[in-house]
Amino acid sequence: DPSRRDGVIGQSTLCLVFTSGTTGLPKAARITQARWLGVGEGWRGFLGLGPDDAFYCVLPLYHVAALMSLLSNAVAAGGRVILRRRFSASRFWRDVREHGITVAQYSGEMCRYLFNQPPTPDDRNHKLRVMTGSGLSPSIWQAFQDRFGIAQVIEGYGGTEINVGMMNIDNRIGSCGRIPFRDRSNARLVKYDRETDSYIRNPDGTLIECGP
């Protein structure tokens, strides 16, 4: 029913997502239609996602990880989403093979739990090519990709608690990523001194942009 979208614009509120409460009680962060759609379009573009992709989600959709970094991508790509109530290390790869999953999401130590499962002849018998998430330890990153044949692992940094999200889209292990689409954004990373808790500045007082 098109009338349900009457008056909806890019800055309209899509939903409220609560922060983790790192600096106090959880706070409601407003997610706009434009931000949600923009994230999906961005991921769709640089990952080459399309209607043939199948997305595997075991994380809660009320959390920014699944909502922003998986569901928006699937909608933008026109793909299908396979939902599980919870993560299961023993069932993960069976689901991936059974449903032809091509994109999956992880959080925290999920990849370590998968890596700690006994090796099987079917470890590479799947269509999964991309895993997105945060928290994959550099100590197992390369071994995890090699064992399961995952072509690309993308870590994201910055959910509801940061103004600029960064992504490691280069398969560079341990990198905190970079600002995506730099040529289309006015966001820049500048040098900061953690010891003095202050920005590092040029003699004229301007901020110093970080280099490669």
Name each model-derived stretch.
Residues Q11, Q33-A34, L59, H99, ...:
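Structural detector for helix-capping/boundary residues
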Residues L14-G38:
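Conserved AMP-binding A3 loop
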